């Protein structure tokens, strides 16, 4: 766990990440790196890139009294690992079905993507944590809803105690579903990620155009209350971009943390999702006189 309250003014995020990658190459170690940015003077690009490198979480800490809560969330997760280096594999079962994009793919520890195949490694698969992958696929004009189109395989554990599960999936149609909202969320944060890069390159007109195009796309393709929170998020992001002082002091860090947590969902950075995390945060808050959160329903992986 790495906490920083200092800035790297030389913008060496890629060099630092590459250095850590070379340092750990050849070590037969399964470890996750969690990074914590505190205050206003630290570099969120470096902190998030280092976390991405080892499949960890990047935490933006805005209040001092939240530091122990974030550390507990990360530490409780490290103490609740079910599998080291679990693998997720997705392949298409039809020649004319293609995998076009995995949202947030650049934030994965590793991946292999082809038209008909996707594979990634989860360095530490944590009890109670939900992993959500949003995938954009290309389908033919005519397709049967009864056809199995994808096969998903999850592999975890050592060779002598390997857990292996294979599921096949069809197209699901109908009313607005969880999948629709996940796709909308992924599209929004993918756009915010692009807009952040444009802002850092001082391409403000292109940045504004990109975000406003996304607002128009949402209004055109989505109806009802579900879209409002994403329109609000885009407007909040535009507000953080407009004032350079706000952007430099906290906007960049907040936007980076939002992108990291939502573009590729790995359970959330501030969600106590298993018994260990709940017990540790309850004990911490009892000792400090703060109110403890309600226990979260927890289902043990059999």
What are these regions (language model features)?
Residues 5-6:
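Active-site metal-binding loops of divalent metal-dependent hydrolases
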Residues 14-32, 38-159:
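Acidic, polar loop-rich interaction surfaces within structured domains
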Residues 1-2:
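A short alpha/beta connector and helix-capping loop motif
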Residues 10:
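Catalytic P-loop NTPase motifs of RecA-like helicase/translocase cores
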Residues 139-302:
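Long, acidic serine/threonine- and proline-rich intrinsically disordered regions
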Residues 35-36, 184:
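A generic structural signal for short
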């Amino acid at each position: 766990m790495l906490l920083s309250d200092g800035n790297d003014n030389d913008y060496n995020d890629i060099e630092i990440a590459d250095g850590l990658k070379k340092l750990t190459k050849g070590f037969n170690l399964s470890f996750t790196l969690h990074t914590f940015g505190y205050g206003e003077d630290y570099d969120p690009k470096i902190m998030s890139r280092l976390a991405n490198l080892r499949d960890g979480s990047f935490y933006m800490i805005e209040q001092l009294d939240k530091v122990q809560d974030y550390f507990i969330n990360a530490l409780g997760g490290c103490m609740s690992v079910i599998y080291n280096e679990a693998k997720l594999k997705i392949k298409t079962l039809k020649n004319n079905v293609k995998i076009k994009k995995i949202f947030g793919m650049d934030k994965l520890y590793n991946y292999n993507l082809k038209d008909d195949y996707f594979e990634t490694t989860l360095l530490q698969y944590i009890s109670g944590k939900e992993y959500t992958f949003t995938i954009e696929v290309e389908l033919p004009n005519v397709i049967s809803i009864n056809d199995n189109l994808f096969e998903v395989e999850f592999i975890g554990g050592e060779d002598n105690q390997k857990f292996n599960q294979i599921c096949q999936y069809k197209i699901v149609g109908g009313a607005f579903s969880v999948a629709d909202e996940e796709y909308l969320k992924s599209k929004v944060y993918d756009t915010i990620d692009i807009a952040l890069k444009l802002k850092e390159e001082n391409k403000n007109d292109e940045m504004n155009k990109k975000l406003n195009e996304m607002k128009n796309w949402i209004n055109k393709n989505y109806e009802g209350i579900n879209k409002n929170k994403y329109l609000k998020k885009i407007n909040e992001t535009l507000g953080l971009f407009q004032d350079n002082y706000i952007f430099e002091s906290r906007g960049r860090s907040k936007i980076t943390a939002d992108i990291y947590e939502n573009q590729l969902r790995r359970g959330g950075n501030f969600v106590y999702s298993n018994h260990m995390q709940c017990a540790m945060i309850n004990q911490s808050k009892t000792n400090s006189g703060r109110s403890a959160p309600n226990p979260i329903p927890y289902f043990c992986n059999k």
